Amino acid sequence: GEYCGESCYLIPCFTPGCYCVSRQCVNKN
């Protein structure tokens, strides 16, 4: 659940293991 330091509005998350939640990239923690 930690923020990955990138947004994902209209673009994917680049950081491995991170996914898009509410327009920001978070990891599974």
Curated annotation (Swiss-Prot):
Intrachain disulfide bonds: 4-18, 8-20, 13-25
Lineage: superkingdom: Eukaryota
Residues joined by cross-link Cyclopeptide (Gly-Asn): 1-29
Example of a GO biological process term: defense response
PTM note: This is a cyclic peptide.
Keywords (A to Z) from UniProt: Disulfide bond, Knottin, Plant defense
SUPFAM superfamilies: Cyclotides (SSF57038)
Pfam families: Cyclotide
Family label: Belongs to the cyclotide family. Bracelet subfamily.
Function recorded in the entry: Probably participates in a plant defense mechanism. Has no activity against bacteria up to a concentration of 80 uM. Has cytotoxic but no hemolytic activity.
Written domain comment of the UniProt record: The presence of a 'disulfide through disulfide knot' structurally defines this protein as a knottin.
Protein name, entry field: Chassatide C10
Organism: Chassalia chartacea
